[in-house]
Amino acid sequence: MSLPGLNFSTTETNTTESTHTIDLKPETEWRYEVAIGGTLHVTLKSGTAEIFGTELPPNKELSIQGKGSIYTWQGCQFVYTAIAGPKGLMSDYTTEDTPHMTMAINLHFALEKMRNEAEQKPKDVAGPRVLIAGPPNSGKTSLAKILLAYATKCDRKPIYISLDPTSVNLGPPGGVHAVQITDLLDVETYGGFGSSEISGPQKLQPLILLSKYFGLEKTTDNFKLFKRSVAQLAVPVLSKLAHDVEAQKSGLIIDTPRVPGNQNKTIEVNLLTDVVSDFGVNVIVVIGNDRLYADLMKKYPVGASGPTVVKVPAFACMDDDESYNRDAQQQEIQQYFYGDAKDMKLGPRIVTVDFSTLHVYKIKPSTQFDDDKADMLERVAEANILPNTVLTVMHAVPGSSEKEILDSEVQGYLHVTEVDEEKNKVKILTPVPGRLPSQVMLLGDTRYHE
């Protein structure tokens, strides 16, 4: 049996295929798609190659998950083996159609020029603050990774902003995140960025995340709350830039959320203009969307004050699909609690707590609002809706106002495994032993089934 459109066999599991050798000509790319639960083992034998801008070390095996590509500027040879997961092996192909890489490195050089110019000016003059916009599957995150990786090669320390609440590049879904990139991106993690300190000791510098929780799957499910979450994330980011000259000159790379194609385009433009205002964006990169580019050019015409808007061709990448994204979210939650498949095993704990001691609030879609002043949170009165949910622990105390809860930072995540309605008890999977760090939690759309 095969998964539709992916050509993955689902009958073989946990088997190792023979080793394959790939020879890439200069400026060519090998694209791969590993089924969720599978692993690709790659060793660079000669030449140079990179995964989204991060160079592969020679003669060292890397364990890779998800979708991506290996690109070479000068030619290379590598070997790989694939270990099947529960949904099969992988698909792969080589292509010489790689104009996106030339575009990416030219864009990097332009941003680096802006950084050099900013360094010659007063410390409050910002380096490039780049917003990457485009439709789903246009390659926004791929381009962001390349720009971040190339910046670190120049000893820069840019801040990456992820505004897609469905993404699992930096942790479980539902949040918007900011993280300063101070080391190589870790291509062995699922998202390709790295792991946070919660995962234990790291081979590379751990990511120190700043997160605000949105909780719903679509930005348009509660546009008011999403814009609030982004604005609240911008406050500490701008404070960091104001007090850290190195970060100020290195700048920002902002990865914008996906907006469904059937949504009113005015919504997307309004969202992007809010992000521009919140973070002081001075460069907008539009990927493969003439209409969005035209709309933004009307907002920010050439010669006027405001960001520079540039359009680049669609970035080559593997298409996403709903089933794959769902599986990826489940895998990321599993790895958050249990560690990755290679060498980072974690020991989560099950704790039983009285539901009456918890302050769990459900995030309401905007369709439930009676007016603009309506509450966005609703206290969960019964525990029976909690099995298989993921609760987001907030840096707040019982009795906090809705504003205080929504403005607080994310401390971590818990998984409700079981509810005893008669005793009003809940069993919770926690990533670390000991007491819960907070009793104030938010319930969004994310579910997890072990």
From Swiss-Prot:
It comes from Yarrowia lipolytica (strain CLIB 122 / E 150). This is mRNA cleavage and polyadenylation factor CLP1. Belongs to the Clp1 family. Clp1 subfamily. Required for endonucleolytic cleavage during polyadenylation-dependent pre-mRNA 3'-end formation. Component of a pre-mRNA cleavage factor complex. Interacts directly with PCF11. The lineage of its organism: Eukaryota, Fungi, Dikarya, Ascomycota, Saccharomycotina. SUPFAM superfamilies: P-loop containing nucleoside triphosphate hydrolases (SSF52540). The keyword Nucleotide-binding applies. Gene3D superfamilies: Clp1, DNA binding domain, P-loop containing nucleotide triphosphate hydrolases, Pre-mRNA cleavage complex subunit Clp1, C-terminal domain. One of its GO terms (molecular function) is polynucleotide 5'-hydroxyl-kinase activity. GO terms for biological process: mRNA 3'-end processing; tRNA splicing, via endonucleolytic cleavage and ligation. Disulfide bonds: none annotated. It is found in: Nucleus. Keywords: ATP-binding, mRNA processing, Nucleotide-binding, Nucleus. InterPro entries: Clp1, Clp1/Grc3, Clp1_C, Clp1_C_sf, Clp1_N, Clp1_N_sf, CLP1_P, P-loop_NTPase. HAMAP family: Clp1.
